[in-house]
From Swiss-Prot:
This is Uncharacterized protein EP152R. GO terms for cellular component: virion component. The keyword Signal applies. Belongs to the asfivirus EP152R family. Keywords: Signal, Virion. It comes from African swine fever virus (strain Badajoz 1971 Vero-adapted) (Ba71V).
Length: 152
């Protein structure tokens, strides 16, 4: 009887550690360069949408419309919390709160991260503000430059 209870507790502890490890991995994966999905950009009338999430979670947004006008190009300190792992889908949800209010994005929104597809969705109350894909080349280049700067 006690051995079954202990086995269940050990299994539960392993599950909690596994979920925590996956969420930490997702938080690290979140950092880097993200660019707008071409279909989403076309539907929303944008030429480009870039998001760079720096370690420490400062977000750099660059949004350009089809006429080449910069709608938003700014550095925004963001607080990223509430990591939630969806068990039936490989999606992580991060709650984001920006320090300032901006015209094109709400003060609070969610990052829905699908690390299997490298896709990030910015949404708030089922309104999608952006669909982005991870730019691994730009992310790796940024980390290399950052490492070079800190060494010299």
């Amino acid at each position: 009887m006690y051995s079954i209870l202990i086995a269940c507790l050990v299994l539960l502890l392993c599950l909690v550690i596994y979920v925590g490890h996956r969420a930490d991995h997702a938080r690290k994966y979140l950092e880097g360069m993200w660019h707008g999905d071409p279909v989403f950009l076309k539907q929303s009338g944008l030429q480009s949408f870039y998001l760079y999430i720096q370690p420490g979670h400062t977000c750099f947004f660059s949004i350009v419309n089809k006429n080449g006008e910069k709608l938003m190009e700014t550095k925004i300190p963001c607080t990223i919390t509430n990591k939630i792992y969806m068990f039936f889908k490989p999606i992580f949800e991060f709650h984001v709160v920006m320090e300032d209010i901006h015209r094109y994005l709400p003060k609070q929104f969610n990052f829905l991260l699908d690390s299997a597809e490298g896709k990030l969705i910015l949404e708030n109350n089922h309104v999608i503000y952006a669909v982005l894909y991870k730019d691994n080349f730009a992310t790796a280049l940024g980390k290399t430059v950052e490492k070079y700067i800190t060494q010299n």
